[in-house]
């Protein structure tokens, strides 16, 4: 296919035009007085959102060169959202400001490579300053404040997230689901829960709801399939002597082994239940080892030289409570706290080392099941449109709150970026080249843009307030919702440090790419044939008489 090629100024101008269009659509959502954006859907009612990344995801421009610029900026929003869960609009505003100021300098003949070096130098210093300025959050009230701001100043959502996090701990899993009612509620699952139910309904101890409930039970954790009851007899006899229930977890239990267990359960000779191992492949073995640590047992594996026939009662796991239904198993643990802590640290290390988002998510789930259980926030709303929008806000707020717990918080409302700009003013740049100094200055000016936009969305002129904040004492900022000068931290106007830092770093990364672009290539659109087309070809001899 033939290509269309733009060079130099033409390429950069077209890309910047696309960046500007996406930035203008996203920036109206910034701050407490940010406006809604209405997004048309081909089917059903339009989506209403105040979430920057949702707006960015929807934008595709007709001009292919402008669209390339817009897609680059979209990457800033999506990356910031993935890393920190919030700050997408701030990142978009910063990226456009740095790109716009940078391209002015490039147009006047300044070397873009030098400008980019200066930008990177300033951003590295700024990111370190944000890290140092962060205040650790520990209380439920502080967590609720962060979550409320990330949920577009919805204090009810903030309180629910703080409540969930308080219950399951910072390593616990919190999932968000759609409620079947109008109310937003939280449900908790203590201990370890996994999606494996009983292999036969005849194991049920409660015939009304067809579930199994054991107290003070033994757990046999076996790596392979069990087909013969002969293998199981020695361990069954040992458990029978203790008069305690037994849960068997194995890759599968089939044939006469399953039949004999069901028969013993129905007759009341032995309280027993059998389930399949959770997970698949390598993850299955890891999860069985987790269960062994959680219950103080041993994974029965031939690799370790243990067979079913030689299992001792001390090698079985123990649980305070076990609940099994047709879909799920829940084990409330009695394991050694020290061993559980060691296992948790090992999983945390694997999370840090993993490069796959999917693997990280699965490891995080395993960690939560070991240390804190699972909380489910069931989001309710009156209409389908409101439900989708609300669920999205809760998910964003949850990610941002995790970021706040991880790296701490800084004053919000764009005031931290102004303080960072003032800090950059004190840095000695005499050893930088002229081009690098220009890049350094671009970052200092661009750091004012988020606050300027927040104030503009509230209906005021940003420049006056930005000048004033530079003369006020540290920690003060402009509260755009009440139109007052306040101490940002004390007033609960805070942002996760990770959100602010990620927004700036991602913005500078993409802006630097735009500045150093010298050529843009895209496919030439083929003109569609609009002449009637269909039917049979006319015989040459059948022209008009």
UniProtKB/Swiss-Prot annotation:
UniProt KW Nucleotide-binding keyword: yes
Gene Ontology CC annotations of this record: cytoplasm
InterPro entries given in the database record: Chaperonin_Cpn60_CS, Cpn60/GroEL, Cpn60/GroEL/TCP-1, GroEL-like_apical_dom_sf, GROEL-like_equatorial_sf, TCP-1-like_intermed_sf
Listed GO MF terms: ATP binding; ATP-dependent protein folding chaperone; isomerase activity; unfolded protein binding
EC number per UniProt: 5.6.1.7
The protein's enzyme class: isomerase
Keywords from the named record: ATP-binding, Chaperone, Cytoplasm, Isomerase, Nucleotide-binding
One BP annotation, GO: protein refolding
Oligomer and partners: Forms a cylinder of 14 subunits composed of two heptameric rings stacked back-to-back. Interacts with the co-chaperonin GroES.
Protein name (database record): Chaperonin GroEL
Originating organism: Borrelia garinii subsp. bavariensis (strain ATCC BAA-2496 / DSM 23469 / PBi) (Borreliella bavariensis)
Gene behind the chain: groEL
């Amino acid at each position: 296919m033939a290509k269309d090629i733009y060079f130099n100024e033409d390429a950069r101008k077209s890309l910047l035009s696309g960046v500007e269009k996406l930035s203008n659509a996203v920036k109206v959502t910034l701050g407490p007085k940010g406006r809604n954006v209405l997004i048309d859907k081909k089917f059903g009612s339009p989506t209403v959102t105040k979430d920057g990344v949702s707006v960015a995801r929807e934008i595709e421009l007709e001009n292919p060169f402008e669209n390339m610029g817009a897609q680059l900026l979209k990457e800033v929003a999506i990356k910031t959202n993935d890393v920190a869960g919030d700050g997408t609009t701030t990142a978009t505003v910063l990226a456009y400001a740095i790109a716009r100021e940078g391209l002015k300098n490039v147009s006047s003949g300044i070397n873009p490579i030098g400008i980019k070096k200066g930008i990177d130098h300033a951003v590295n210093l700024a990111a370190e300053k944000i890290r140092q300025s962060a205040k650790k959050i520990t209380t439920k009230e502080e967590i609720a404040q962060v979550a409320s701001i990330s949920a577009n100043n919805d204090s009810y959502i903030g309180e629910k997230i703080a409540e969930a996090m308080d219950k399951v701990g910072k390593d616990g899993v919190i999932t968000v689901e759609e409620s079947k009612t109008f109310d937003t509620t939280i449900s908790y699952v203590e201990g370890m829960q996994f999606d494996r139910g009983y292999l036969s309904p005849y194991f049920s101890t409660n015939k009304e709801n067809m579930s199994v409930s054991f107290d003070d039970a033994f757990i046999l954790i076996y790596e392979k399939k069990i087909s013969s009851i002969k293998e199981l007899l020695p361990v069954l006899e040992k458990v029978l002597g203790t008069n305690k229930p037994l849960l068997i977890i194995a890759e599968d239990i089939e044939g006469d082994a399953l039949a004999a267990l069901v028969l013993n359960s129905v007759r009341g000779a032995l309280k027993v239940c059998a389930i399949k191992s959770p997970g698949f492949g390598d993850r299955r073995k890891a999860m069985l080892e987790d269960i062994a640590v959680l219950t103080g047992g041993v994974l029965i594996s031939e690799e370790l030289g243990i067979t079913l026939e030689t299992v001792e009662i001390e090698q079985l796991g123990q649980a305070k409570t076990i609940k099994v239904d047709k879909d799920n198993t829940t084990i409330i643990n009695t394991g050694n706290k020290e061993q559980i802590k060691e296992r948790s640290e090992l999983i945390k290390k694997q999370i840090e080392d993993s490069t796959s988002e999917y693997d990280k998510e699965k490891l995080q789930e395993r960690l939560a099941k070991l240390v804190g259980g699972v909380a489910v926030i069931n989001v309710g709303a009156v209409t389908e449109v409101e439900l989708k929008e609300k669920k999205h806000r809760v998910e964003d707020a949850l990610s941002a709150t995790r970021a706040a717990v991880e790296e701490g918080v800084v004053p919000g409302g764009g005031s931290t970026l102004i303080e960072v700009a003032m800090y950059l003013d004190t840095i000695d740049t005499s050893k930088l080249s002229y081009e690098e100094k220009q890049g350094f200055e671009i970052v200092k000016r661009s750091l004012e843009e988020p606050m300027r936009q927040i104030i503009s969305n509230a209906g005021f002129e940003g420049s006056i307030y930005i000048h004033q904040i530079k003369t006020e004492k540290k920690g003060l900022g402009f509260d755009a919702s009440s139109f007052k000068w306040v101490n940002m931290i004390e007033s609960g106007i805070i942002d996760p440090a990770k959100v602010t830092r990620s927004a700036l770093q991602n913005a500078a990364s993409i802006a630097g790419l735009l500045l150093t672009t010298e050529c843009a290539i895209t496919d030439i659109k083929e003109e569609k044939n609009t002449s009637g087309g269909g039917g049979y070809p006319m015989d040459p001899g059948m022209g008009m008489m």
